[in-house]
């Protein structure tokens, strides 16, 4: 069955996913960084719920989740484990609620990690960071009941 879907961002709907930068967060203590990231991740989990409801209400059967739904998750200096975030239980619960919603309403979710995920890289550091990012994407996929993670398979 052919499913038309939405990709990550809404132009006209008041559904916004938040991001941040490592440069911005580096000005703060580690605790402040984690609190900021916790608020952003909680917001993004809630925004995903709105996006999924929008898809259901408009008979859109697929939604591609932005690869930065948990911003900077695997960043070498700012990265974090989800359990380090003060709102981690609420964040995970909200994502899992989204997964149940998708099952109940036949809305498919997919993920598409960024183009810098290069498993074929001859550089060990690039390969290791790619694997870490895919593990993070797989964790999110499990929470939201996503059955596909598209990856780039190009040469190095």
Sequence positions of predicted segments:
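Alpha/beta catalytic barrel-like cores
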Residues: 1-107, 117-120, 125-128, 139-144
């Amino acid at each position: 069955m052919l499913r038309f879907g939405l990709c990550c961002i809404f132009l006209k709907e008041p559904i916004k996913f938040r991001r941040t930068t490592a440069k911005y967060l580096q000005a703060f203590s580690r605790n402040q960084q984690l609190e900021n990231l916790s608020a952003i991740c909680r917001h993004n989990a809630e925004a995903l719920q709105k996006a999924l409801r929008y898809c259901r209400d408009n008979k859109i059967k697929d939604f591609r989740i932005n690869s930065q739904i948990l911003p900077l998750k695997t960043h070498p200096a700012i990265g974090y484990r989800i359990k380090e975030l003060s709102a981690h239980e609420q964040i995970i619960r909200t994502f899992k609620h989204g997964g149940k919603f998708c099952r109940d309403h036949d809305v498919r979710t997919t993920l598409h990690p960024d183009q810098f995920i290069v498993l074929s890289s001859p550089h060990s550091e690039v390969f290791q960071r790619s694997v870490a990012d895919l593990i993070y994407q797989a964790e999110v996929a499990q929470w939201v009941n996503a059955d596909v993670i598209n990856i780039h398979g190009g040469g190095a």
